[in-house]
Amino acid sequence: MHELSLAGGILQLLEDAARRERFARVTLLRLEAGKLCGVEVRALRFALEAIASGTCLEGACIEIEEPEGQAWCLQCNAAVALAERGAPCSGCGGYRLQPTAGTELRVMDMLVEDHWCPE
């Protein structure tokens, strides 16, 4: 389950930002996990909630958007929607596809409380 490792990386980014920007906690975290990025969104949410205790993420609302996959078909030279990796081109049925969208995993934005108390 690589989602736990990804959640740890996201939490580290948030903790680093909290120290640097001097905010106390995240109240809303918005992520984007494209349909082609290879992340199970429910598992990522579970992992984030599981490791949030005692951190700036504890109690935060976590929203994860899942943009659709898009690809360029090298056989029929067309942009096509792609529901999952390994799916054929919806136009020609070919498999020579270059993903162009839906592969991202990123922090979109966050809402924070700025009651900073240095340790």
Swiss-Prot record:
Indicate the transmembrane segments per the record. Answer: none
User: One MF term from GO for this chain?
Assistant: zinc ion binding
Q: Which residues bind Ni(2+)?
A: H2
Residues annotated as binding Zn(2+): C73, C76, C89, C92
Does the record carry Metal-binding as a key word? yes
- Extract the InterPro entries matched here: Hydgase_Ni_incorp_HypA/HybF_CS (IPR020538), HypA/HybF (IPR000688)
Enumerate the Pfam families for this protein.
HypA
What keywords tag this UniProt record? Metal-binding, Nickel, Plasmid, Zinc
Example of a GO biological process term: protein modification process
User: What is the documented function of this protein?
Assistant: Involved in the maturation of [NiFe] hydrogenases. Required for nickel insertion into the metal center of the hydrogenase.
- Family statement drawn from the similarity comment of this UniProt entry: Belongs to the HypA/HybF family.
Protein name in UniProt: Hydrogenase maturation factor HypA
Q: Which species does this protein come from?
A: Cupriavidus necator (strain ATCC 17699 / DSM 428 / KCTC 22496 / NCIMB 10442 / H16 / Stanier 337) (Ralstonia eutropha)
Q: Which gene encodes it?
A: hypA
